[in-house]
């Protein structure tokens, strides 16, 4: 028996997001694509006008499920040109099964996208996995960024990475058993999930995904590491947003005394599942952009 009403809410949310993503894939929102420099097809959506803002979703997500369902695409598109990406291994984009096709390569996709759209610079907003990719992009191509927003993530360093969890997650995905280890790691509250909860939510997370591609994404995560030396010389204005109850908060805290041009905003009471849908998340991002352009 499932012990928590929260379980039903989490599962219902995942099912709804899967349906939302499926509707987008069937053409209810306009999509475009280009071929990245290594030959992988990348799909993206563009809405609005103004300074460009690239949105990078989390693992198992899509542009629609992370950003569309939360209303962030629509709200930002009122003031900015929003470019929401289905990252490789996800959604409508290509899904190679080689870990070498991920990691740093996922950050370079953003550079390729900007080149494809003939944009010299853009704001980049990433959440969870997308946040770690944004950190890598800050290190790799700072001249292409107007600013960076790192949500639900922080410093992707070897010391803070949970290699055991990533290994277990990759093995689970390779066996076709879903994202259970990630469910256990991100589960909010002190009471752990039941095996039934882990199984149900772990399978719902990957219902519309290629599990072998996701496993390759996970095995490529180590290539997102960023050195302290690069963080100390950073010149890209960087906003880090994380929930006070997010298990990845130590990654965010570690940036405070290390990263130049960095500020941390904590959403009190929010966890990894609720931060993105909090009105405070979007309000904080919007205020950051307006401050940078002095256009309030």
Regions found by a protein language model. Give the residues of each.
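Active-site loop/oxyanion-hole signature of alpha/beta-hydrolase fold enzymes
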Residues: 74, 84-122
């Amino acid at each position: 028996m499932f012990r928590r009403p929260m379980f039903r809410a989490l599962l219902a949310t995942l099912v709804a997001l899967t349906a939302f993503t499926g509707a987008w894939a069937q053409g209810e929102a306009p999509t475009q694509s280009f071929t990245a420099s290594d030959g992988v097809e990348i799909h993206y959506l563009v809405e609005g006008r103004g300074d460009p803002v690239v949105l990078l979703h989390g693992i198992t997500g899509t542009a629609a499920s992370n950003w569309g369902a939360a209303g962030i695409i629509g709200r930002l598109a009122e003031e900015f040109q929003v470019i929401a990406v289905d990252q490789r291994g996800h959604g409508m984009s290509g899904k190679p099964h080689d870990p070498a096709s991920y990691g740093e390569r996922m950050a370079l996709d953003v550079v390729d996208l900007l080149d494809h759209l003939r944009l010299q610079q853009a704001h980049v907003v990433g959440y969870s996995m997308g946040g770690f990719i944004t950190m890598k992009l800050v290190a790799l191509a700072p001249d292409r960024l107007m600013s960076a927003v790192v949500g639900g993530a922080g410093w992707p360093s070897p010391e803070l990475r949970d290699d055991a969890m990533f290994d277990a997650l990759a093995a689970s995905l390779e066996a076709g058993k879903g994202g259970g280890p990630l469910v256990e790691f991100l589960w909010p509250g002190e009471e752990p999930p039941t095996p039934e909860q882990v199984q149900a939510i772990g399978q719902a997370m990957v219902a519309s995904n290629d599990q072998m591609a996701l496993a390759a994404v996970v095995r490529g995560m180590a290539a997102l590491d960023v050195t302290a030396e690069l963080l100390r010389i950073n010149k890209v204005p960087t906003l880090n947003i994380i929930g006070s109850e997010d298990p990845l908060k130590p990654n965010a805290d570690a940036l405070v005394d290390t990263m130049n041009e960095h500020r941390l905003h904590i959403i009190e009471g929010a966890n990894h599942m609720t931060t993105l849908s909090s009105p405070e998340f979007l309000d904080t991002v919007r205020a950051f952009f307006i401050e940078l352009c002095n256009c309030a």
